[in-house]
Amino acid sequence: MGYYSLTEVTAVQYAKEHGYFEKKANVVCHEIGDGNLNYVFKLDDGVKSIIIKQALPYAKVVGESWPLSIKRATIESKALQIFAKYVPEYVPVVYSHDEELAVTVIEDLSRLTITRKGLIDGEEYPLLSQHIGRFLANVLFYTSDFGLQSEEKRVLEGTFVNPDLCKITEDLVFTDPFGHYDTNDYESELQLAVDELWSDKILKLKVAQYKYKFLTRKEALIHGDLHTGSIFSSPSETKVIDPEFATYGPFGFDIGQFIANLLLNALSREEEQRGVLFFHIEKTWSYFVETFTKLWIGEGVEAYTKEKQWLPIILQNIFTDAVGFAGCELIRRTIGLAHVADLEEITNKETRIQAKKQAISLGKELIKYESKNADIQLFRTLFQQTVSGGIKA
């Protein structure tokens, strides 16, 4: 039959045909997706529920003028299964994948909240940083040359060649926000800050280097889009979702993106409410280092993991990259194509513009920063130096 786009009606038919519900079951189905690239259906018969996710052959955020390969759904399904091999507690269960229809049937996580929404609403997730730090350490270590035999790594790397979505990252994170491109989207009040950004040749040279790292450093399997909208949370659980951007890339990329999105939330808060975000930034890194170090010592398969002075160099490189990638993410989420609710939902326009100017300034500082040691306090320090006072909604 070939590919066709599901509707709420045909999603139920699909689920019944594939044995997820009885033929006579009264299944309620709603399209709940709020992302840019897919349909997401929740199906519930009152006894059990599932999620059906279907990749569209174009970007929803733009329309059919921006075609995309539906093979990204297979990438996403395989990435979730790889993650589950090492950290099953931090990802949803994948029940099945249909490559022809680009459909993946996965666990319903409705008991949890999208982390971005929860943070905006003031919810607290005390284990978020512990879980994300451990998730990243395990996935990055075990899919790298340090935790995987080189032959196996090369085969796995070939599985995650993801040209369409990598091109989106190349353009929307590293290129378009730093020049005159039609994809950019920002208020006129930001024009002066944007002009200064675009004319900063030192900054653009640094961005070029980070883009080159993304293009060439195939260090480990990365999620590729690890923002707070790609994580479900509760006070006791954390689940990473939506790895359709998964590819082999730099160790520091996911760490930087996650930290940047915590910083964006911090920018939306009054000063006295920001401490929890810096707690999570700092604990994410400390749990990452602790877990990665244990794996390096106990599970390392590469000969030079026995050299004690090698690990600190690797961790320093990861940190340096994470700082720069975080800066790029801050700027793209402020003036690029895909904005974030953390800033967009600040109701007072003057305050919202102020927060966006601060995001641009902080992003520039992070990109330009020359880190000589992996001091996670750097994010708090640069934030305090760049941002004065609190945000008043």
UniProtKB/Swiss-Prot annotation:
Q: Which GO terms describe its molecular function?
A: ATP binding; S-methyl-5-thioribose kinase activity
The pathway this protein participates in, as annotated, is: Amino-acid biosynthesis; L-methionine biosynthesis via salvage pathway; S-methyl-5-thio-alpha-D-ribose 1-phosphate from S-methyl-5'-thioadenosine (hydrolase route): step 2/2
Identify which top EC class this enzyme belongs to. transferase
EC id: 2.7.1.100
Stored InterPro entries: Aminoglycoside_PTrfase, Kinase-like_dom_sf, Methylthioribose_kinase
Q: Where do the annotations place ATP binding?
A: 38, 53, 107-109, 242-244
Q: Name one Pfam family in it.
A: APH
Q: Which UniProt keywords apply?
A: Amino-acid biosynthesis, ATP-binding, Kinase, Methionine biosynthesis, Nucleotide-binding, Transferase
According to its UniProt record, which reaction does this protein catalyse?
Answer: 5-(methylsulfanyl)-D-ribose + ATP = 5-(methylsulfanyl)-alpha-D-ribose 1-phosphate + ADP + H(+)
Q: Which domain of life is it from?
A: Bacteria
Q: Which residues form the signal peptide?
A: none
Q: Which GO terms describe its biological process?
A: L-methionine salvage from methylthioadenosine
- Name the residues that bind substrate: 225, 332
Primary role: Catalyzes the phosphorylation of methylthioribose into methylthioribose-1-phosphate.
Query: How does this protein assemble?
Result: Homodimer.
The Swiss-Prot or TrEMBL record describes its family as follows: Belongs to the methylthioribose kinase family.
Please identify the protein, giving its name as recorded: Methylthioribose kinase
Gene symbol here is: mtnK
